[in-house]
Each structure stands twice: as structure tokens, then as C-alpha cells.
């Protein structure tokens, strides 16, 4: 029940916390959520919150300690509001509380000043109940009057306090979060054990066992450390001192960013961390109940916060609550000092405690939540030196006072503490007491985590900031520039992403905790995709509900107790979901950071895990075992591996440990998926809700996405469903968007996302591996597609509770999903980002943008994935990377793509369809691959899907199928039939329809003229298609089919029917050109699978949004058809010129594709001039497919991937050239020195000439001179009547002997 509450709270919390953070919400929030909020508030309030947490703790002592969340949520929330100071003071009566209260009071005052808290908000905030666990003492609930207010203030932007409270489980390792926040080391020593809120070390989880746990808590702290580390990164950014001892060390191997504060330590430290984690695991096993519950709580908190509803996500989890509690304290301290911006932002709401908790709540002193007031740092008191926590949670360690010190100490201290659980707390408290204090400073870490987690507030994530804010964060962020802070943190995170997983190992011991840690790390990753996190948290609430029994039992179950296996499983699942969401984000980042090899490794592992995860329980266990093994391997492996291991380890520990120690089978799969997700996330950080992203975030995300194919994976699926980790991947894109928006689909979305994330991770690594795995993967993908289709359809309807049914299919998907998902998710991610960034960004983004754009618009989750992501990024990717990426996409590209049922938008994104189509797609793709466009196929399909969806937004499947041209049917059907996906495709058909066939007919609607555009996109065409898409991004988010020969035909058919055009698969490239256009038969069904896989996933809304977007774009294109034509023709000319031989040599059909590149625009340009294709390849396909084919083929087919890179480069150059030429021509055109036709000709020729100049530079002066010469020449010809119908014709040949032909077909020819 608590989990449900939490779930509910989370959803609400994420929504409200983000926006308002009103206390009213608190009640709704599950206790967990409340606690998180309270914690956050406490954090926000600085450590003050911590104290309140303690107070709460007493109330929740037994229950709360174990199920802190439940009590914490509501009671705290309300209590806090009402009791605030009084409660704090009352509770303060407790021995240790008195000291804390003293500190607390100052924090109260402090909070307002620090957080600028909104009085109303803070008051409303539920009060954080912090269990003060002094050493062995029972937790003493500390009233945190200030907590709420501060949290509120902290959450100002968002209702952080509730989350904080909720997150801040009473126990919650107090927080390691606390550590981060309360990090204020000073208090830590005294309060370390008792450390206020829950002397998190001792009993964060188990309330009764606090005394014994104290030592154990230190062990958990290790996990906490790790967990905390994610926050540390931020803190580190804020306070360098901690950097040295970064908890992130485990992650450091990859060279996690020192800014990641936790991760900057040297690899050695990382290793130490890992060792510690292992030790912790052992310790945790000893204190499983306690430690693990604490860990879990912290993890849950981390996950929840990170996901924006940390508390909610894992509300059920103990972690959330404990985390929350610690967090709360953290915020409390942070608020004054740390709450700083994050807290002020309110984004910190969830992360503050998370940091401490996860990082090393217990170990660090657990009490990072020390409620050290600004001046109260001393408060540390005593606070119980009880050794349980280095810094009392309750203590408000003034981050400002010794935040840095504390931070540094904290990090090492946490470790030190780790060794001596009980004593450690004290020692830590003393030497490391600071660590918790640093926790406060580590607010940055919080922030990073928070930022990540802050899915909704996406960038608000800065709980960390709040924590470190006091000194570092404060000065740095001033608590104001959350966005900047988040970006910074994100960057740090990226750097330390690989390290971010480090905490996982320790948490591994406590399956729950690892989860949380993972969550936190994920959060970090999420930080980049805070939105995703936020979505995820919103989504996750439901899964956590099961954790309602959050008792020590639950904790224990997390701790691997079979008894509470089920609930733990549920909890874990939700956590996994959120985690996987965050993880995916984080993973992407990490992966990116780590580099290809690591990525591959991770992916492979993930993939393996995924496969094993497919079988939910049984495999889960094995998966866990495997993960554990991996963990060990990674640990042994060393820095590089460590990160990966950590990331995996986190999942493994989360899931593996859980499995090992009696984890719920389901959770382990979740964990595995989570791991995958994490990697995926690492890959890219595209928040689930782009709408929530700020420009900064978008920029960061876009940058990330553009930078590597890691982005490919879609962080978008906010949270993969924990339960069906296997399936998670597929729907994540669409589902994630949709689900997040719907909330009801959260589990499905989560699953999809998780699956997608893992899949994506896998896919990337599979890029190379995939070829080998293609056969198996294809089968799997096909199944997955099917599943996806089913699940997608189910999920699509927001109302449907498809998530449940979705999960079953998902497991199958999981196994093969990696490949399909990966391409899809990659695209998706980029798409989302781009869409928010710029729907019309013509680069590779263009295709992706629409889908994401729509999604981001919230139109629905348009999981439109365009291979274009890869393509668009290709220019930025290294050739090697790009080729594999494209290959990977090709193999998996078909998998996920489908916009799959554009018509059935509501229907699943057709991710399933993608799967169904996967096999054919793969087969075909393989064929295409052989043609050097293997990757293209999938992409084409995706693009096509989008185009279809746009043009046919809801077209009938029949029409779409019909769309498929006979040729495509012929060419494609053969391939397609093999895929069983055909059956699923039907549903997907609408989207799938075009997706598959080279997607040439991206948007049939646009196209009759644009058919060309889609015509021949093959491997190389793929890029050309990219260009098309860049130019006509929405025009056809046509996926370039790897062997997009059919692209041409598709393009032809596309005009007739968007789906049909897309349908023409690249297989029938040559025949497709004409046939596709001519016959858009219902052949689509067989190809359908192709389409789906390659196509873009579109949810109902997504489809609509996409359609609207495409149409808008089309209108714009039509409006500026002349421009588009010029550009396209110029591009085509250049491209044709560039790769005419290839194009012709490659495939006659593709030759038409020559125009394909510009096709997008070309199509627009050539509505009537389809003949445009006549160019030198096959006779102009009905729609100028010939030209498109020509160009595409030449560009893509022949030259293949390597060519693609070149092509993209040229394309970009071309685009710049076009801009320059246009600028130069404009004056003449305005003066009417030249006619429109001449203008176009000159533009085309000049661009061609410039692009083919030896220097390759675009010199405005030279461009101007060239244009002037052309203008004069045209004028001259006109005067001398030399300008026949096509003035450019004569001059053009002279000017550009070679290009004329191409140029002609490009632009003039169509008219001619």
C-alpha cells in the first residue's frame, strides 16, 4: 500500500513537486513520497529537515524505519506543515534531538534565507520525520518544523518537500543523502551514528535494528557511498575537496568527472570503492535487513528523486524513505548552505537526501542529513556521535561551515566509516563526520542526481546543489541557476557517468539499495534527462506501491529476503523502472563517457542480462548471478570495467543481489533491464519529457545526442517497466512519452524504456556484434516486434492497462529487443531532443525531431524513431562509430522504428510491430547491409514510418498496405514474409507501411512529388535520406532502408500513399522505384514488419503530432517550395555529382534515389516533376525517384557507410553553401535581375560548384563573386535569347559540365 501511495505520490509528486510542491500533495503523496519530500524539504531546509526526519523517525521508528516512507509521507507532510518547528522542538526533546533541534531551528531560519523558501510551501511541506538513531539507540523522531518549510523552499520550484519527505524515508540511511546534504561533516561526527534522522547508518532501513545496524549501516553506507557518489559528482563540482575521495571512484575508472564529485577519485579509489562495496555487500548481507533496507531506501530515494519522484518511484522501497529522510536532512543543511539553488529551485526536492542516502548514508555518517544549521554545523553533536552516522542526519551540518571539508571527509569518511560500521560512524563522524557535511556540499551531487532525477523539473534536479549549495553550490549556483548547475552537473555526470555505477556494487549487497543507488546513478544519468527521470518517477509510483509493506521485512526482502520477495520484487521493479529510466540516461552518458569498448562490453553484458532477464523469475536469478559475476569481473577488471561493472553491477546488485539474497525474480530482471537501461541512458540523456527540458537541458542533451550514437538510445522511455525488463526496451520510446503522460502506462513505459534502454545499450555494442548476432537478434527482434506491437497497442491507449499485458510480451522483446530497441531508442532519444530543440533542424535530427517534437509537445508519445538520428548525428560521429551505428541501426533499426501504426497511433507505437518486422527487416537489412546500406534499411523504415504517419497520419491500414508498391511488395514481401512480424505489422501497418520500404515515401501525404525523395535511400542513401530529412525532416522521416533500392520505388509509391512509399523496401530498390509508385499494394502487410522495425514508433498522439508536424513542415516546404527545390536540387546536384557513378553503378533503381537525398525537398519540389529522377540512373521513376535514387544510390549505396560520413559532411557543407549562395543571390533576385528559374539554377549550380571546390571551404566573398558571375551569365544569356526554356541549361553545362545532368534532374529536370 505504501508503495502504491508512493506510486501515487510519486506521480503526483513529480507533477506537483515539480511544479508546486504543495503540501496538499503531500497527503496524496504516499508516505514515501511525503518522506521524500520531507527529506527534500529537510535538505532544502538544510539539515534542519534532517532533524525533523529524526522526529519522524520516532514516529515511524519501527514502521518508518522499515517503512519509513509510509509514515513519512503523510505524517511528515502534514506533520511537518503543522508541527514544523513545534514538532521539531518537541521531538528535539529526545536527547540527541535536542541538539538537533537547536540546529534545526537555525535551519528553520536558515532554510528561508537559504532557500528563499516559500513560506507557504515550506510550511506545507510535510515535515520530515527523521529517525534519530543514535548509535544503538532507537531512532528518535526529530520533528523538523523547519524541514518542511525549508524543503518547501527548497522545492520552491517544485514541491520538493513532499518528495523530500517521502523520499526521505525515516531511515533512509539518513541519508547518505544526509551525508551529501548534511554532509556537513562537523555534525557528522557526533551525529554520525545517531545522526539524526536516521542515524541512517544504523538503521536506515530497519528501525528496530538501528542499534546493531549502526555498524551495518556503515556497510550500507558503502553502497550509500556509491549511491551518494552519483550526487557527489555534483558536489564535487561544487566542492572540489570531496573530489579526491569521490565516492564515485568506483565509477572513476572511466574517468568520471571529478565534477561528479563522487567519481573523481582515482581508479584506485574506485577499486577501493568497489572493494568497499563488496565489503558492504557482505556487511549488508549481514545486516541485510538493516543495511539493505537502508540501501534500498536510499536507492529508492535516489531513484525516486532522480526520477523526479524518487520517493514515489521507490516509495515502497525502504530506500526512498530512508533516503528521503536523509535527503531531507541533506536539504535542510543544504538548504541553508546546500539547498542552495537546487533546493531553492525545488528541484532538489528529491535528490538531496538521495545523495546522502545512496552515496553513503550509513557509511558516510549516514547522517549526511545532519541538520547543521548554517551556524549549527556544530550541532553535529553530538548528535549522536552514536557512531551510527558520521553526521547525524538530524544534524544540520552547515555545508557552508565545513561543507567542503565535510565533503572530502565524507567521501573518504564514508569509506572509512564503512570499515567500521558502528565505530566507523563515529570515526567517520569525527574524521569523516565531514563527509556527511560534504554531503551538504555534495548538494551538487544531489543536484546532479537531482537534476537527473528531476524529470519534470528536469533541470531542477539540483538537490545536490542545495546540499553543496551552501558553499560550493551556493556560491557556484547560488541556488539560482539550477539549469546551469544541472548542465554542469550533467557534464560532470557525463564525465563520471561510467563511474556513476560504482555505488551499485555496494548496493548490490542490498538488492534494494543497489536499486536505489542505481536509481541515483540513473538519476544522474537522468540528470541529463531529468525529464525522463521525472517521467520515470511519475511512472514509477505505481510499481512501488507493492512495497507498501515497507517494513524491515520489506527492507529485508530488498535485502534479499525471499519472504518479502514479492513485495521486494515489486519494489525493485518500480525501482528498476525508475532506475532503468535513470540508468538508461545515465548509462548513455556513462557509455558515452566510457567509450565504445566499454559500451560494447556493457551492452554485451546487458544483452546477456537481458536475454537471461527475459525469463522473469528464473532467468532473473541467473541474470542476477550473471550480473554478480559481471560485477566481480568488472571489479577485478579495473577502472574501465569498473564503471561498466558498476553500472551493470548496480543493476546486477540491484537485481542480482536481490536475486542472490532472495530478491524477487521479477526485480532481478528489472535490475538487468535497468542495467541495460542505465547503459542506454548513459548512452544518451534525453529526458522523457522534452517539454520539461529547458534550453540548457536540450542543448546538453542535444549535444550528447549529437556527439555519440549513445544518444541513440532513447532516454525517453522515462521508466522501463521493472516487471518486464525484457520488454522494457521496445515501447520505451513511444510508450515512455505516452506512458509518462498517461501515468497509467508507467509500467509499460518503464518496461519498454528499460528494455529499450538495455536494448539500446546492447544495440550500440551490438553495432558490430549485431552483424554476427543478426540472425538470432532478428528472430528475437521479430518476436520483440510482435510483442512490442501487442504491448504497444495495449500501451498506446492511455486508458488501457496495457502495461500489464505489455510486460508479458516484453520479456520476449527483451532478448532480441536490444537490437531493435537500440536503434529505436537511439533515434528516439535524439528525436526527442531534436524535436524539442528544433523540429526543423534539418540535420540528421530532422527526422527524429518530428517524432520527439510531437512527443515533447506532449502530443502523445510519438516514438517516431528515425534512423536519421544516427544519420543526422553521423556527421558528428566518427566514421567508425557511425558505420557500426548505422549497421546497428540497420539491424535493430528495423526493430524499433516503426511509427508503426501511424494510424493506430493509439496502438502501440508499433514497437512490437517493429519487432515483428524485425526479422524480415534484419534479413532484408542484411541484404541491404550487404549493399552497404544495411543500417539504412532500418532507418529508412523509421523515416518512412514517420512520413507515413505524417502523410497518412491515420490512413487506413489498407491504404498503407496498398501504399506499398507492388514492386516493393515484390521486393519487400519476399523478405518481409519471412518475418513473422507481418501479423503484428497489420496493426502497425499504418506506420509500418512505409517505414519498411526505404521509407522513401516518408510522408505520402506530402508526396506525390516527394516520392522521389524517398526513392532510393540505401546504405549510403541512408545518409542522403538524412539529407532529405534534414531538408525535409518531417517530410518523410523516411527511414533509409539499408539497401534502399526500393527506396526509389517506395518514393514512387509513397506519393500515392505515404505508407506505401515507405513500404517499398530497399530490397526492390530498382524495381521499386517505378513499381512502388505505381502499385501501392497492400503488399505492405508482409513488408509491414519491415516498416515497423524500421519505421518510427508513434503513439496515437505521437502519430497525430507527427502528422501535424509533418504537415506543417510540408506547408512550410510547399510555401517555400522554390527554396526547398533550390536547396534540394543543389543538394541533389551536388550529391549526384558527388556520387553519380556509385549511384548509377549501384542500382539503377537507387539511382533515382539520387534525388532521394534532396528528395525530401526534392519531393516537395517535384510534386509534378517526378520525372526529376530521370537523372542518370533509371528512367525517372514516376516521381523523380530516378533522380532521388540516383543520388541516394550513388551517395549511399555505392559508397556505403564511409560514404555516408563523407556524404553527411558534404551535406552540411552543402547546406552552408546553400545559405551563403542564397544570401548572395537574394539582392539580384530582389532586383529582379534574375528570374525565379534562374535563381534556382544559379543556386543549384553555385552550391554544387562551391561544394565541389578543391578547397572545400565556403568563402562568402568567393560565393558572392561566383553568384555574381552566374547572374551576369544568366543575364547575358537572357539578353542574347540564349536562355531556352531552361536558362540554366546552357550555362549550367558550361559552368558545371558534370553537374548539369544531375543538377538538371535535381531541379530543372523535373520541370523539364
Curated annotation (Swiss-Prot):
Organism: Homo sapiens (Human)
Chain residue numbers at which the record places covalent cross-link Glycyl lysine isopeptide (Lys-Gly) (interchain with G-Cter in SUMO2): 865
A Gene Ontology cellular-component term: nucleus
Phosphotyrosine: residues bearing it: 732
Gene field: SCAF1
Comp. bias (Basic and acidic residues): 7-27, 226-235, 649-660, 739-749, 763-792, 866-884, 1189-1209
Protein name listed in UniProt: Splicing factor, arginine/serine-rich 19
Compositionally skewed regions (Pro residues) per UniProt: 206-223, 430-439, 975-988, 1300-1312
Entry-annotated residues carrying Phosphothreonine: 335, 706, 976, 989, 1001
Coiled coil: none
Modification sites for Phosphoserine: 239, 448, 453, 498, 500, 526, 548, 612, 614, 719, 725, 734, 738, 872, 874, 929, 936, 963, 965, 992
Region (Necessary for interaction with the CTD domain of POLR2A) location: 1187-1312
Keyword Heme in annotation: no
Molecular function in Gene Ontology: protein domain specific binding; RNA binding; RNA polymerase II C-terminal domain binding
Residue ranges, compositional bias (Gly residues): 929-938
Signal sequence annotation: none
Taxonomic classification: Eukaryota, Metazoa, Chordata, Craniata, Vertebrata
Amino acid at each position: 500500500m505504501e508503495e502504491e501511495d508512493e506510486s501515487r505520490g510519486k506521480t503526483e509528486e513529480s507533477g506537483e513537486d515539480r511544479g508546486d510542491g504543495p503540501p496538499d500533495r503531500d497527503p496524496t503523496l504516499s508516505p514515501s513520497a511525503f518522506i521524500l519530500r520531507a527529506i527534500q524539504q529537510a535538505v532544502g531546509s538544510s539539515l534542519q529537515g534532517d532533524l525533523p526526519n529524526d522526529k519522524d523517525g520516532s514516529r515511524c521508528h519501527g514502521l518508518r524505519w522499515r517503512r519509513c516512507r509510509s509514515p513519512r509521507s503523510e505524517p511528515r507532510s502534514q506533520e511537518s506543515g503543522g508541527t514544523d518547528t513545534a514538532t521539531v522542538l518537541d521531538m528535539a526533546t529526545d536527547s540527541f534531538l535536542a541538539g538537533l533541534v537547536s540546529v534545526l531551528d537555525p535551519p528553520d531560519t536558515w532554510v528561508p534565507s537559504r532557500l528563499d523558501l516559500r513560506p507557504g510551501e515550506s510550511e506545507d511541506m510535510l515535515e520530515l520525520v527523521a529517525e534519530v538513531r543514535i548509535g544503538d539507540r532507537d531512532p528518535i523522531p526529530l520533528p523538523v518544523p523547519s524541514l518542511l518549510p525549508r524543503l518547501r523552499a527548497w522545492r520552491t520550484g517544485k514541491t520538493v518537500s513532499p518528495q523530500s519527505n517521502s523520499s526521505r524515508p525515516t531511515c533512509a540511511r539518513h541519508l547518505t543523502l544526509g551525508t551529501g546534504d548534511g554532509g556537513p561533516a562537523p555534525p557528522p561526527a557526533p551525529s554520525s551514528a545517531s545522526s539524526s534522522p536516521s542515524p541512517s547508518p544504523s538503521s536506515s532501513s530497519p528501525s528496530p535494528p538501528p542499534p546493531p545496524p549502526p555498524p551495518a549501516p556503515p556497510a550500507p553506507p558503502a553502497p550509500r557511498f556509491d549511491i551518494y557518489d552519483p550526487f557527489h559528482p555534483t558536489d564535487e563540482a561544487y566542492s572540489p575537496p570531496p573530489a579526491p575521495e569521490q565516492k564515485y571512484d568506483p565509477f572513476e575508472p572511466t574517468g568520471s568527472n571529478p565534477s561528479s564529485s563522487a567519481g573523481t577519485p582515482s581508479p584506485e579509489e574506485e577499486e577501493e570503492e568497489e572493494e568497499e562495496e563488496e565489503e558492504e555487500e557482505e556487511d549488508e548481507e549481514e545486516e541485510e535487513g538493516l543495511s539493505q533496507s537502508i540501501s534500498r531506501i536510499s536507492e529508492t530515494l535516489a531513484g525516486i528523486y532522480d526520477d523526479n519522484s524518487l520517493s514515489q518511484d521507490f516509495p515502497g522501497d525502504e530506500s526512498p524513505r530512508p533516503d528521503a529522510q536523509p535527503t531531507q536532512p541533506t536539504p535542510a543543511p543544504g538548504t541553508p548552505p546546500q539547498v542552495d539553488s537546487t533546493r531553492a529551485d525545488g528541484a532538489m526536492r528529491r535528490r538531496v537526501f538521495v545523495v546522502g542516502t545512496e552515496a553513503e548514508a550509513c557509511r558516510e555518517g549516514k547522517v549526511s542529513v545532519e541538520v547543521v544549521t548554517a551556524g549549527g554545523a556544530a550541532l553535529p553533536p553530538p548528535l549522536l556521535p552514536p557512531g551510527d552516522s558520521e553526521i547525524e542526519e538530524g544534524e544540520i551540518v552547515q555545508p557552508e561551515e565545513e561543507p567542503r571539508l565535510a565533503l572530502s571527509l565524507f567521501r573518504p569518511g564514508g569509506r572509512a566509516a564503512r570499515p567500521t560500521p558502528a565505530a566507523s560512524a563515529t570515526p567517520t563522524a569525527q574524521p569523516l563526520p565531514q563527509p556527511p557535511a560534504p554531503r551538504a556540499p555534495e548538494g551538487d551531487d544531489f543536484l546532479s542526481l537531482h537534476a537527473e532525477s528531476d524529470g519534470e523539473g528536469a533541470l531542477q534536479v539540483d538537490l545536490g546543489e542545495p546540499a553543496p549549495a551552501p558553499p560550493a553550490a551556493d556560491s557556484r549556483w547560488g541556488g539560482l541557476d539550477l539549469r546551469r548547475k544541472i548542465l554542469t552537473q550533467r557534464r560532470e555526470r557525463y564525465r563520471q557517468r561510467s563511474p556513476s555505477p560504482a555505488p551499485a556494487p555496494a548496493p548490490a549487497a542490498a538488492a534494494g539499495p543497489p536499486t536505489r543507488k542505481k536509481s541515483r546513478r540513473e538519476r544522474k544519468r537522468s540528470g541529463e534527462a531529468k525529464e525522463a527521470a521525472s517521467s520515470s518517477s511519475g511512472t514509477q509510483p505505481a510499481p512501488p506501491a507493492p512495497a507498501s509493506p515497507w517494513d524491515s521485512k520489506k527492507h529485508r526482502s530488498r535485502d534479499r529476503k525471499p519472504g518479502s520477495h514479492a513485495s521486494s520484487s515489486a519494489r525493485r521493479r518500480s525501482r528498476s523502472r525508475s532506475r532503468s529510466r535513470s540508468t538508461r540516461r545515465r548509462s548513455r552518458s556513462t557509455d558515452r563517457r566510457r567509450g565504445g569498448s566499454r559500451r560494447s562490453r556493457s551492452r554485451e553484458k546487458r544483452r546477456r542480462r537481458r536475454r537471461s532477464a527475459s525469463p522473469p523469475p528464473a532467468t532473473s536469478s541467473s541474470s542476477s548471478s550473471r550480473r554478480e559475476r559481471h560485477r566481480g569481473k568488472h571489479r577485478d577488471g579495473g577502472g574501465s570495467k569498473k564503471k561498466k561493472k558498476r553500472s551493470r553491477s548496480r543493476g546486477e546488485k540491484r537485481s542480482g543481489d536481490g536475486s542472490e539474497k532472495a530478491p524477487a525474480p521479477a526485480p532481478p530482471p528489472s535490475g538487468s533491464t535497468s542495467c541495460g537501461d542505465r547503459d542506454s541512458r548513459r548512452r544518451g540523456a534525453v529526458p522523457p519529457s522534452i517539454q520539461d527540458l529547458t534550453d540548457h537541458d536540450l542543448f546538453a542533451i542535444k549535444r550528447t545526442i549529437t556527439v555519440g550514437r549513445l544518444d541513440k538510445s532513447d532516454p525517453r522511455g522515462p521508466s522501463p517497466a521493472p516487471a518486464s525488463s525484457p520488454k522494457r526496451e521496445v515501447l520505451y520510446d513511444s510508450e515512455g512519452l505516452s506512458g509518462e503522460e498517461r501515468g497509467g502506462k508507467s509500467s509499460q513505459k518503464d518496461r519498454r524504456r528499460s528494455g529499450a534502454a538495455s536494448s539500446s545499450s546492447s544495440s550500440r555494442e551490438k553495432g558490430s556484434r549485431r552483424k554476427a548476432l543478426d540472425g538470432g537478434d532478428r528472430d528475437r527482434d521479430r518476436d520483440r516486434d510482435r510483442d512490442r506491437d501487442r504491448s504497444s497497442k495495449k500501451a498506446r491507449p492511455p486508458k488501457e492497462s496495457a502495461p500489464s499485458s505489455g510486460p508479458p510480451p516484453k520479456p520476449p522483446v527483451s532478448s532480441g529487443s536490444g537490437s531493435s530497441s537500440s536503434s529505436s531508442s537511439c533515434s528516439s532519444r535524439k528525436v526527442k531532443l531534436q524535436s524539442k530543440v528544433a523540429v526543423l533542424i534539418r540535420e540528421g535530427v530532422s527526422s527524429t525531431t518530428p517524432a520527439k517534437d510531437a512527443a515533447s509537445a506532449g502530443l502523445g508519445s510519438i516514438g517516431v524513431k528515425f534512423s536519421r538520428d544516427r544519420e543526422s548525428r553521423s556527421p558528428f560521429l566518427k566514421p567508425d562509430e557511425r558505420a557500426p551505428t548505422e549497421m546497428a541501426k540497420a539491424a535493430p533499426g528495423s526493430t524499433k522504428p516503426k511509427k508503426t501504426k501511424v494510424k493506430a497511433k493509439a496502438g502501440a507505437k508499433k514497437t512490437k510491430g517493429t519487432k515483428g518486422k524485425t526479422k524480415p527487416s534484419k534479413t532484408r537489412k542484411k541484404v541491404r547491409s550487404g549493399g552497404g546500406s544495411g543500417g539504412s534499411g532500418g532507418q529508412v523504415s523509421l523515416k518512412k514510418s514517420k512520413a507515413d504517419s505524417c502523410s497518412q497520419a491515420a490512413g487506413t491500414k489498407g491504404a498503407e498496405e496498398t501504399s506499398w508498391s507492388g514492386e516493393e511488395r515484390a521486393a519487400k514481401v519476399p523478405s518481409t514474409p519471412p518475418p513473422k512480424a507481418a501479423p503484428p505489422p497489420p496493426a502497425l501497418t499504418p506506420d509500418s507501411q512505409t517505414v519498411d520500404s526505404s521509407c522513401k515515401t516518408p510522408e505520402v501525404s506530402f508526396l506525390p512529388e516527394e516520392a522521389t525523395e524517398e526513392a532510393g535511400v540505401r546504405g549510403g542513401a541512408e545518409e542522403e535520406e538524412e539529407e532529405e530529412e534534414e531538408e525535409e525532416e518531417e517530410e518523410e522521416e523516411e527511414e533509409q532502408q539499408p539497401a534502399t533500392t526500393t527506396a526509389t520505388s517506395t518514393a514512387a509509391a509513397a506519393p500515392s500513399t505515404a505508407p506505401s512509399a515507405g513500404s517499398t523496401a530497399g530490397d526492390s530498390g530498382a524495381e521499386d522505384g517505378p513499381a512502388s509508385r505505381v502499385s501501392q499494394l497492400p503488399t505492405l502487410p508482409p513488408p509491414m514488419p519491415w516498416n515497423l522495425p524500421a519505421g518510427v514508433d508513434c503513439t496515437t498522439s505521437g502519430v497525430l503530432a507527427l502528422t501535424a508536424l509533418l504537415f506543417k513542415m510540408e506547408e512550410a516546404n510547399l510555401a517555400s517550395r522554390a527554396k526547398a527545390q533550390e536547396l534540394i536540387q543543389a543538394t541533389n546536384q551536388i550529391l549526384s555529382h558527388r556520387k553519380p557513378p556509385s549511384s548509377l553503378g549501384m542500382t539503377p533503381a537507387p539511382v533515382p534515389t539520387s534525388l532521394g537525398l534532396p528528395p525530401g525537398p526534392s519531393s516537395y519540389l517535384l510534386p509534378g516533376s517526378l520525372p526529376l529522377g530521370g537523372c542518370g540512373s533509371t528512367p525517372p521513376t514516376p516521381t523523380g525517384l530516378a533522380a532521388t535514387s540516383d543520388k541516394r544510390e550513388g551517395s549511399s549505396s555505392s559508397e556505403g557507410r564511409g560514404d555516408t560520413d563523407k556524404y553527411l559532411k558534404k551535406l552540411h557543407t552543402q547546406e552552408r553553401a546553400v545559405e551563403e549562395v542564397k544570401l548572395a543571390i537574394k539582392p539580384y533576385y530582389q532586383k529582379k535581375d534574375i528570374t525565379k528559374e534562374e535563381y534556382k539554377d544559379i543556386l543549384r549550380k553555385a552550391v554544387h560548384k562551391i561544394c565541389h571546390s578543391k578547397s572545400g571551404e565556403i568563402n562568402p566573398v568567393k560565393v558572392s563573386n561566383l553568384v555574381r558571375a552566374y547572374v551576369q551569365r544568366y543575364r547575358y544569356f537572357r539578353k542574347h535569347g540564349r536562355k531556352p526554356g531552361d536558362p540554366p541549361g546552357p550555362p549550367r553545362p558550361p559552368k558545371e559540365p558534370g553537374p548539369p545532368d544531375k543538377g538538371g534532374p535535381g531541379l530543372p529536370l523535373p520541370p523539364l
